[in-house]
Amino acid sequence: TWIGAIFGGAILEPLIGTTKIHHDPNRFQYLGSANDDVYVCLARKDAPVKKIEDAMTTELIVGASMASSSADFATMLNHEIHTKFREVVGYNGSRPIMLAMEKNEVQGACGFAWPSINVTNPNWFGPEGMMRVLAQTHVKGYPALNAMGIPLARDFAKTDEEREVMDLYFSHTTFGRPYLVAPEVPKDRVEALRKAFMATMTDPEFIIEAKKAGLDIDAVDGPEVQRLIGKIYAASPDLIAKVKRALQPDP
């Protein structure tokens, strides 16, 4: 049995993306996801924006890559909660954006997965760090960030429509690193693989080794991933069209 490992964005792309991907993610059988990726917006502490509400009245210059989460999340928030993120698009990936933030070429960024950036750049955060987290672009949020009082961007929606648009787009981050098998794989084998997947993801020794490698494990089981994907693909054409519009930068 072949097992596929993809990014969560590849599941959403056929529905709302601009590229012509010819597959139906809803047909596959999902074993689970290694991560529930909570994406965040960040700002340098010396920037004029100290909290997400400030970004609704004060411009924040953010770094972004073309057709990436760093661009999409900032654009989405500009449309749905009326932030004033001014995107500097053209950075070739997340590392150049991080370097630009450190050099103060840009004042912040959106579309960074907290479980990853907190591991790779732990010195950025905390009382002596140079960065602050403005908001979580996620439906539920990361427990540690919730405990710190970091708000969810969706909570600043002024209408149900704005909230629904964000929720549909943000939902794909719940399955950040999904694993899948083909539609024809027998159900009993899928069930066995799902159990084995979660047993691995929750094994204490595996988690220790993952942390040594700088990987954060926050697994989501197969049935939940399957349910979420089914819900996304059951969205109305009207809502999907609104999400597409919200991902289009202003001219």
Sequence positions of predicted segments:
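Conserved hydrophobic/amphipathic secondary-structure segments
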Residues: T1-G176, A241-P249
